[in-house]
Amino acid sequence: MKRLTQTLVLCLLTTFPVLAQSNYVSEVWVSDLGNGKYKNPVLYADYSDPDACRVGDDFYMTSSSFGCLPGLQILHSKDLVNWTFIGAAVPDALAPIQTPERPEHGNRIWAPSIRHHNGEFYIFWGDPDQGAFMVKAKDPKGPWSEPVLVKAGKGIIDTCPLWDEDGKVYLVHAYAGSRAGLKSVITICELNAEATKAITPSRIVFDGHEAHQTCEGPKFYKRNGYYYIFHPAGGVPTGWQVVLRSKNVYGPY
């Protein structure tokens, strides 16, 4: 009788986990439906202000990391749906221009842009309290260079570079009104050939106060002789997307 009881207990202990596993449904979000289709969001996580570039058949993405470390996490994809973490561009420390006395949630690394030029990857971002920074690497997995302060200034945010056919390098950016006392404008400055330093003042190329307030987050492209600036406006909850175009880098757009 004792042996029978032990056998029954053993059977119950081995059966219940199997039943539990057979009834378990994973709650992990999977955007790839497996049939050539997908559902949004493709990343069910906090990847604010994402930006991506394509190199051959590969896509690389980064996003705002604010005061968190490792910062500027790099994701890789072949199809823009399935993403894999491959590294971080700011793994150990934030740009050491000013060290706050206490953690500053929501500050530091805002709205980066990742680009590939002449065999190197570049990431530009704005620190709303310090200015525009840049890091670069030959391999997106790293190692990445130390952050370089490209343009100092309060309120400089949402930076994006453009390498023109004539060798000139430009940087488009917006302003955080909370720091600069100025917002709803898009500006452009020229950088040196190494893209490490601004060599001209920023010029306003678009003023959104009349019809496109809170214009920010500009992305800079050139195609078929036209310069394009894509940017959101109207604020996060009720905003819209604006596309600007000009034959001249400084406008009119």
Predicted feature locations:
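Positively charged n-region of N-terminal signal peptides that target proteins for export
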Residues: 1-4
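Bacterial N-terminal signal peptides
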Residues: 7-17
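Carbohydrate-active catalytic/glycan-binding domains of CAZyme proteins
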Residues: 21-253
